[in-house]
Amino acid sequence: MRGKLITLEGIDGSGKSTVAKKLQENSELRVFEPVFTREPTRGTLTGNAVENAIQSDTDQLAELFLFTADHAEHLAKLVKPALEDGKTVISDRYSDSRYAYQGITLKNRLDNPLEWVRDLHRGWTVIPDLTFLFDIEPEIAVKRCGKRGEQTKFEKIEFLRGVRELFLGLAAEEPERFVIVDASGSPEDVEKAVVQKILDFVQRIE
């Protein structure tokens, strides 16, 4: 039986990646041996190219294609093989991040960037079975980002407002796939809520 793909999404500063790390250490989840991964990938040719683009003034379209190339490589080398092996894959960021983030970065370049980016993925990407959207007010998120040190170009409040709006729009379109998580609480409380939802989901499909 094909495995299931679970993704974690949210704006920068939502605490998503902090919770993703906690999930890897969670004893309740270890029972079904999930495969943990992330986008952009780390230590790969495509992932390194994306990280360099994020830290530089790369053209927005070029940046999109770098993200998409990394996604394709990620699917081919890790996600699809793991799913075909019947494993549950949990990814910190996935295609919805591209739809929301590049939907904003390209708004002055394309008439409908969100749909354009989605069309770019149709026919070859793997749609997640369950997506957690870590929702938080951009003002709180930016403060959290500031505590981490130097901010990236994506960690600006007006930009994150637009990204959050697109994320919530995506969730409204597919309520059966998305679970909106209040990310304003402590990482421990958020982790507990997410773990319970994952366990419920896994038990339901077994």
Swiss-Prot record:
<dbReference type="GO" id="GO:0006233">
    <property type="term" value="P:dTDP biosynthetic process"/>
</dbReference>
<keyword id="KW-0808">Transferase</keyword>
<dbReference type="GO" id="GO:0006227">
    <property type="term" value="P:dUDP biosynthetic process"/>
</dbReference>
<dbReference type="GO" id="GO:0005524">
    <property type="term" value="F:ATP binding"/>
</dbReference>
<protein>
    <recommendedName>
        <fullName>Probable thymidylate kinase</fullName>
        <ecNumber>2.7.4.9</ecNumber>
    </recommendedName>
</protein>
<dbReference type="Pfam" id="PF02223">
    <property type="entry name" value="Thymidylate_kin"/>
</dbReference>
<comment type="similarity">
    <text>Belongs to the thymidylate kinase family.</text>
</comment>
<dbReference type="InterPro" id="IPR027417">
    <property type="entry name" value="P-loop_NTPase"/>
</dbReference>
<dbReference type="InterPro" id="IPR039430">
    <property type="entry name" value="Thymidylate_kin-like_dom"/>
</dbReference>
<keyword id="KW-0067">ATP-binding</keyword>
<keyword id="KW-0547">Nucleotide-binding</keyword>
<keyword id="KW-0545">Nucleotide biosynthesis</keyword>
<feature type="binding site">
    <location>
        <begin position="10"/>
        <end position="17"/>
    </location>
    <ligand>
        <name>ATP</name>
    </ligand>
</feature>
<dbReference type="GO" id="GO:0005737">
    <property type="term" value="C:cytoplasm"/>
</dbReference>
<keyword id="KW-0418">Kinase</keyword>
<dbReference type="InterPro" id="IPR018094">
    <property type="entry name" value="Thymidylate_kinase"/>
</dbReference>
<dbReference type="GO" id="GO:0006235">
    <property type="term" value="P:dTTP biosynthetic process"/>
</dbReference>
<dbReference type="GO" id="GO:0004798">
    <property type="term" value="F:dTMP kinase activity"/>
</dbReference>
